[in-house]
Regions:
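Conserved helicase NTPase motor core
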Residues: 3-19, 23-31, 116, 211, ...
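Helicase P-loop NTPase motor core
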Residues: 26-39, 43, 324-326, 333-426, ...
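Accessory C-terminal helicase-associated subdomains
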Residues: 223-226, 454-516, 524, 539-540, ...
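Conserved non-catalytic scaffold segment of RNase H-like nuclease domains
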Residues: 513-516, 523-623, 628, 650, ...
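Conserved P-loop NTPase-based nucleic-acid remodeling module centered on helicase motor cores
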Residues: 55-175, 317, 633, 655-658
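C-terminal accessory regions
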Residues: 683, 801-809, 832-900
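P-loop NTPase Walker
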Residues: 1-107, 264, 345, 818, ...
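Conserved RecA-like helicase ATPase core segment
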Residues: 2, 45, 278-370, 375, ...
Length: 900
């Protein structure tokens, strides 16, 4: 790949494109004209002149093109902060926005076309593999999917030119709607379409109207079934927190259209615009900052080949009319005082050859005080370490509210400087080398937390099996976990059972004992505080209901929701009706009657952990009893189905009932849910019967036994203790998740599977003080895992800097780690010739990179900037060599005083 590193290498036609800094621009470029190179150079050029990477947005049509663009950018910009730059297609941006801005539920999944087909195939009781393998059937499914998007856009009032799949509303569909409107005496308009869509099955009888033309009747049936399955698809995605690729666009458009607080971008470039559809272009318009934007469109009329995906050649015509902006670049610095910015700008202009007019300005005209800008020469490398440490201590002592960073060029320097600070008892935080969160030991701790929150987490179990040294490689660990899944087993079976499994245990009880299937309806989802307002149960033996069911309604002082999401809560009216008739039981009476009904039987529920634990806490409040003190074991039909049918899209009760054509209704009334769960339990038993023999054979296999024994020895004690305590609230004030991480660390350290983590306390403090801060989240491990674990999984060591939890006000950091951070005081360590630029550099590119590194280091300062260097160095043979201040400082040295 060709590498271009300065603006002079661009030809005359490219320079205006790269230098464009304001307005709307359209670049039409045939293949081979260096379009990708220009896109990359624009990134480097703009960033060197003050545009932050996180204010830039680089969009293209395909993921492949995005990867090529990013690779080219990386070839000309050697900068760790480049990770802040967004490069991707429009869908990628929308996905990133929706998830990072918490615009969708945390557990939302992005489904592809085949998964979308699978959802509809489930409703139609068809084989998804058969559909995918049949072009015509697959096309029909696509039309249903596209139609659901068309309805969404119609419902939300999108302009017609932004509709993604207007073609899915065919002429035949229009004929059908018109006929239904005639029969129902409705006006033919968009609202009529939406009305028919919402009630598609109710209008099927219209297709059987007397004297109706059979062709028109077929059109009506086709449309109404298409509408029905499209609505099923919409509802399924909503209930299961799923988005398809088109949803990413539609949701982002609606949010940006309505919410002015969404981040707008002052600098955008878009490649292959001829391939964008109207909705994508509309989203880009919404992303653009209104004040003085820089938007660069690049495309080629000769390569517009994606009309089947909604792209229109008219897009370029629109852009030709729009793109008439002037070329200029306005920036304003809101951080640095003028005396610092003068240094940065002179350095950028004279050392990095940046046009002064394109460099930032500031309104902060505070004058420099004596000692704010210093050059610190030391006699030797050894004394430089001491001098810099002493200066950091002085700044720490004299300015109790300020932060100080010593920025070094290598990890070795960071280590030596850290030792020098330790010798003078200066507390500091060192950020260099491998990130703490990337180490195997911390990953093992994270995996432990993940499986406590979700025992079906494949990757985390793999890490535990490898990290605890049960297997020598991740590959072997993955194979082992995959084998368990095929056998309807979980690694938890090996830790919670001696010679059995969850499935086998359930089946034995199902065949030989009575089971009480139960469900609760509650005032909310907080198992520690909410009340049970309905509790229902049925007793079964061998799947047959024995005796009478139990259905109790209970008084509460807490409010009952009228709606469950967008659906009316059927219990609301029923509850208040019983309240008015005086038919509600006191919590004490109802709970005691339930216990009497239960006796010593085994409990079973769907998602039983919720029902069991809210029951336990209600018993504690009202009867002073606990389920944990009783002999009743409990099983979960949801867990059983996840083990027995591991690849379903949903394990909600209603989905399972429909998927397996089971008798029962999921109505959000406990008694109905119990009846439905009984049907599901029978299915679980049927499926379990075919799994137990294989499980037993696996557990008894001579090659498996040693691994199971090793696994238990390495992890069982820790897991069982934490697993059993997930629903216990921590009363001592310490965060439950923090306590669990501590316990895991102590355990793994004692077992000898990890080395000591010197900086673990930083992680624990950060979690306690900066992350686990929502008072609405109960201090119980299960609740904190569900609420916080996704964010915790993205942490980096540099997140600690300037956080509330960090106690140190002095930092030692490499240049790369300092990117994106700011400090009151900055000391650049050993800015000598031979370091800046490095004496081992072999090209001008390397020298220029070192100049940029020095600029980055200096520009972290908000108040004081000190440049330190050693005037002599010692080689490995003991020879002394004179050194000078880096020549990069020649043009700005006049601003600095020199210490003596």
């Amino acid at each position: 790949m060709e590498t271009i590193n300065d603006i002079e290498t661009l030809d005359k036609s490219q320079i205006p494109v790269v230098e464009a800094s304001s307005g709307y621009h359209l670049v039409l470029a045939s293949p081979g004209c260096g379009k990708t190179h220009i896109l990359a150079e624009r990134i480097r050029y703009a960033h060197a002149r003050g545009v932050d990477y996180d204010d830039m947005l680089c969009l293209t049509f395909t993921n492949r093109a995005a990867r090529e663009m990013l690779n080219r950018i990386r070839s000309v910009v050697d900068d760790v902060e480049l990770e802040k730059l967004q490069v991707g297609n429009v869908h990628h941006f929308c996905s990133k926005f929706l998830f990072e801005e918490n615009r969708v539920e945390a557990d939302t999944s992005i489904i592809d076309d085949e998964e979308a087909v699978s959802i509809i195939a489930d409703y139609r009781n068809e084989s998804e593999e058969g559909v995918i393998g049949d072009f015509n059937r697959y096309k029909a499914y696509q039309e249903i999917i596209f139609f659901s998007h068309m309805i969404y856009q119609m419902r939300n009032g999108h302009p017609w030119q932004y509709f993604l799949h207007s073609e899915s509303f065919t002429d035949d569909d229009r004929d059908a709607v018109k006929e239904i409107c005639r029969l129902q005496r409705m006006e033919y308009n968009e609202q009529a379409v939406l009305q028919i869509y919402r009630n598609a099955q109710l209008y099927l009888d219209d297709a059987d109207a007397p004297r109706l033309d059979w062709k028109l009747a077929n059109k009506m049936r086709h449309l109404l079934w298409k509408m029905y399955y499209a609505s099923c698809y919409e509802r399924y995605k909503s209930e299961h927190h799923m988005l398809d690729f088109e949803d990413l666009l539609l949701l982002t458009y609606d949010i940006y259209k309505k919410d002015e607080s969404c981040k707008r971008y002052p600098w955008i470039q878009v490649d292959e615009v001829q391939d964008l559809n109207g909705m994508q272009l509309a989203i880009i318009d919404l992303l653009t900052k209104k004040e003085q934007p820089m938007v660069m469109y690049l495309g080629d009329e000769q390569q517009a080949i994606f009309s089947f995906m909604g792209a229109k050649l008219e897009t370029l015509t629109i852009l030709k009319m729009r793109c008439k902006g002037n070329i200029h670049h306005l920036l304003r610095n809101h951080r640095s005082p003028k005396y610092l910015l003068d240094v940065f700008n002179d350095y950028a202009e004279k050392q990095m050859k940046i046009d002064r007019e394109l460099l930032p300005m500031t309104d902060n005209n505070v004058k420099a005080q004596t000692g704010d800008l210093l050059i610190m020469p030391s006699s030797s490398m050894e004394t430089e370490l001491e001098d810099v440490a002493d200066m950091a201590l002085r700044l720490y002592t004299e300015n109790e509210r300020e932060t100080t960073a010593v920025i070094v060029s290598s990890n070795a320097d960071a280590d030596r400087l850290s030792k020098a600070m330790t010798r003078i008892l200066l507390n500091h935080f060192k950020v260099s080398g491998r990130d703490l969160f990337d180490t195997p030991s911390v990953k093992l701790l994270m995996a432990h937390l993940n499986v406590l929150g979700n025992e079906h987490n494949f990757l985390s179990w793999t890490r535990i099996l490898k990290g605890s040294k049960v297997f020598e490689s991740n590959a072997l660990a993955r194979r082992f976990v995959h084998k368990l899944k095929k056998l309807a087993m979980s690694p938890t079976d090996l830790l919670l059972y001696e010679a059995s499994t969850y499935v086998a245990d359930f089946l034995a009880i199902y065949n030989n004992e009575e089971i009480v299937v139960f469900d609760t309806e509650t005032t909310g989802l907080n198992v520690f505080e909410d009340d049970i307002i309905e509790i229902a149960a049925m007793r079964i033996r061998n799947g047959v209901i024995v005796g009478e069911p139990l259905d109790l309604y209970i008084e509460t002082n807490r409010p009952i929701l009228k709606k469950l999401g967008d659906v009316d809560n059927p219990l609301y009216e029923l509850y208040h009706s019983k309240l008015n008739r005086g038919e509600l039981l006191s919590p004490q009476e109802a709970l005691q009657r339930f216990l009497d009904y239960l006796g010593n039987a085994v409990l079973l529920g769907h998602n039983v952990n919720f029902d069991y634990n809210i029951l336990d806490n209600n018993l504690r409040r009202h009867l002073g009893l606990s389920m944990r003190e009783r002999p009743n074991r409990h099983f979960d039909s949801l867990k059983l189905m996840r083990l027995l049918e591991g690849n379903l899209a949903s394990y909600k009760l209603e989905s399972l009932l429909e998927r397996f054509n089971l008798v029962g209704e999921n109505s959000h009334r406990a008694i109905d849910d119990v009846g439905a769960t009984v049907s599901l339990v029978r299915l679980c038993a049927e499926k379990s019967a075919g799994k137990v023999a294989g499980q037993q054979a696996f557990l008894a296999h001579p090659r498996v036994i040693p691994y199971v024994r090793k696994f238990r020895s390495a992890y069982q004690e820790l897991f069982v203790s934490a697993y059993n305590g997930r629903y216990s609230q921590t009363a001592d004030g310490e965060k439950a998740l923090v306590k669990a991480m501590k316990q895991a660390y102590d355990y793994f350290l004692e077992m000898g599977v990890i080395d000591a983590i010197d900086r673990l306390n930083y992680v624990l403090r950060y979690l306690a003080m900066d992350m686990l801060t929502d008072d609405h989240v109960p201090n119980a491990l299960v609740e904190q895992l569900a609420y916080y674990m996704m964010d915790i999984s993205t942490l980096k060591e540099s997140d600690f800097c300037n956080s509330r939890s960090i106690r140190e006000r002095v930092y030692v950091t490499t240049v790369h780690k300092a990117k994106g951070l700011e400090f009151d005081n900055v000391i650049v360590f050993d800015a000598a010739n031979g370091r800046y630029p490095n004496s081992f550099n072999k090209s001008k590119k390397n020298d220029e990179e070192d100049a940029r590194k020095l600029y980055v280091a200096m520009s972290r300062a908000k108040r004081r900037l000190y440049i330190a260097y050693a005037m002599t160095s010692k080689d490995r043979y003991g020879g002394i060599h004179n050194r000078e201040l880096t020549p990069f400082m020649n043009e700005v040295q006049e601003y600095f005083s020199i210490t003596r």
